[in-house]
From Swiss-Prot:
Gene of this entry: aat
EC class: transferase
GO molecular function: leucyl-tRNA--protein transferase activity
KW Coiled coil (keyword) present: no
Protein name per the record: Leucyl/phenylalanyl-tRNA--protein transferase
Keywords: Acyltransferase, Cytoplasm, Transferase
GO biological process: one example: protein catabolic process
Family per record: Belongs to the L/F-transferase family.
Length: 235
């Protein structure tokens, strides 16, 4: 029977296979959110998820929600919409604003887990070149976006948001296009939910996810792929 691990100042984690089954995937408690610990967590297939004012909780659920990068991504109606849209798309031009957008209130939630502490932790990771954002612009207004952490040839998605219909889906379509161009193998979406299912996510057993992660996590990627840049959607 697996038991919950308590972290100290060391950045080490127990093996993800030791995570609890109830609640599904809870692996460890405690520690901190400094960049080296966060980077090590994603490298091992672990991520933080906890409510504000609660202890830090670390997870590795079974199964794992994943996407295989594909282009073009989205339904026929989304592609038709984007062909007519005047939106602009960028990479890493407004990381903090994207994270703040993801932290905003949602109709389906009473609050958000993306506290000020979380926002600054991922911003530090971004400053070190380990966390990146996709932005969707309507003129000068940020209307949608997403952020996440690449680990070799795997992209670990954290959150997305929209202020106009289809803006988060557009950001995800741009992410897919960008990852396909750079030969990424998998998008980790963490915990399955109805929204992810509607986008085409698949449930992958944790053992299979970890096998793929271990295979591709040390793969070198283009140093310039996450430079600040404007991206043009291709059809």
């Amino acid at each position: 029977m697996n038991s919950l691990s308590y972290l100290n100042q060391s950045i080490g984690f127990p093996p993800p296979e030791q995570a609890l089954t109830d609640p599904n995937g809870l692996l460890a408690i405690g520690g901190d959110l400094r960049p080296d610990r966060l980077a090590q967590a994603y490298y091992q297939g672990i991520f933080p998820w906890f409510n504000a004012n609660d202890p830090i909780l670390w997870w590795s659920p079974d199964p794992r929600a994943v996407f295989t990068p594909s282009h073009p991504f989205g339904s026929k109606s989304l592609i038709k919409f984007l062909k007519k849209s005047a939106w602009r798309f960028t990479i890493n031009q407004a990381f903090l604003d994207v994270v703040a957008g993801c932290a905003g209130p949602r109709n389906t939630q009473d609050g958000t887990w993306i506290s000020a502490e979380i926002q600054m932790a991922y911003y530090e990771l971004h400053l070190q070149g380990h966390a990146h954002s996709i932005e969707v612009w309507d003129g000068e207004q940020l209307v949608g976006g997403l952020y996440g952490i690449p680990v070799g040839g795997i992209f670990c998605g954290e959150s997305m948001f929209h202020r106009q219909t289809n803006a988060s889906k557009a950001a995800f379509a741009i992410l897919n296009q960008h990852l396909v161009k750079h030969d990424f193998q998998l998008i980790d979406a963490q915990v399955m939910n109805p929204h992810l299912v509607s986008l085409g996510a698949k449930a992958l057993p944790r053992s299979e996810f970890l096998t793929i992660l271990h295979q591709y996590r040390d793969r070198a990627t283009s140093a310039s792929m996450w430079n600040k840049q404007e991206v043009f959607i291709e059809f």
